[in-house]
């Protein structure tokens, strides 16, 4: 059975501000199944932002597990991500999940990959999903050459990705921590 997939999630950190945004398109093969999905959320008492890309059911499974790790480690983002990655590498069921997460709190942004890796993005900019490369390139150019806020950079990056990637639409949800 073919999986639901296709999205763009991008995060930009500048100083003490971070924005995380994503589009709303859910695709099954070459059919748009939903245009207004919410793939970016606030969790852990609104202190942590998370965005997910990949198979929808897999992403929700990982999100649930990540929230449990955050609770267990009292909101310590890095510790929760590393513990999730350890589980991901050792649990046979988790190893088959095809999804990625970007997580951010007031001080840290992390990418949790489908291989169970935890990455701290260079320059505070990262993106995942089918339109991730477009969004990340746009965000990097905007961050290096403008005074735009993280939210504005995320918005424009998602717009550019939506113009270029057939699996990304212009329904955007953006969350910030300032």
Swiss-Prot record:
NCBIfam families: ATP_dep_HslV (TIGR03692), PRK05456.1 (NF003964). Belongs to the peptidase T1B family. HslV subfamily. GO terms for molecular function: metal ion binding; threonine-type endopeptidase activity. This is ATP-dependent protease subunit HslV. GO terms for biological process: proteolysis involved in protein catabolic process. The keyword DNA-binding does not apply. HAMAP family: HslV. Keywords: Allosteric enzyme, Cytoplasm, Hydrolase, Metal-binding, Protease, Sodium, Threonine protease. GO terms for cellular component: HslUV protease complex; proteasome core complex. It comes from the Bacteria. A double ring-shaped homohexamer of HslV is capped on each side by a ring-shaped HslU homohexamer. The assembly of the HslU/HslV complex is dependent on binding of ATP. It is an enzyme of class 3 (hydrolase). It holds the Pfam family Proteasome. Na(+) binds at residues 162, 165, 168. Its EC number is 3.4.25.2. It comes from Burkholderia vietnamiensis (strain G4 / LMG 22486). Allosterically activated by HslU binding. It is found in: Cytoplasm. SUPFAM superfamilies: N-terminal nucleophile aminohydrolases (Ntn hydrolases) (SSF56235).
């Amino acid at each position: 059975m073919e999986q639901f997939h296709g999205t763009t999630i991008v995060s930009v950190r500048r100083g003490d501000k971070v924005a995380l945004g994503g589009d709303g398109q859910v695709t099954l093969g070459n059919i748009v199944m939903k245009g207004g999905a919410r793939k970016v959320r606030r969790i852990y008492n609104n202190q942590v932002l998370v965005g997910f890309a990949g198979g929808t059911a897999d992403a929700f499974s990982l999100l649930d597990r990540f929230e449990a790790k955050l609770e267990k480690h009292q909101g310590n983002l890095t510790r929760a991500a590393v513990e999730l990655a350890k589980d991901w590498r050792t649990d046979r069921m988790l190893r088959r999940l095809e999804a990625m997460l970007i997580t951010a709190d007031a001080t840290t942004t992390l990418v949790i990959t489908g291989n169970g890796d935890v990455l701290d993005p260079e320059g505070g900019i990262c993106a995942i999903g089918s339109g991730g490369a477009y969004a990340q390139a746009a965000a990097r150019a905007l961050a290096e050459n403008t005074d735009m806020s993280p939210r504005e950079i995320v918005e424009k990056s998602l717009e550019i990705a939506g113009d270029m990637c057939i699996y990304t639409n212009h329904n955007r949800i953006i969350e910030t921590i300032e």
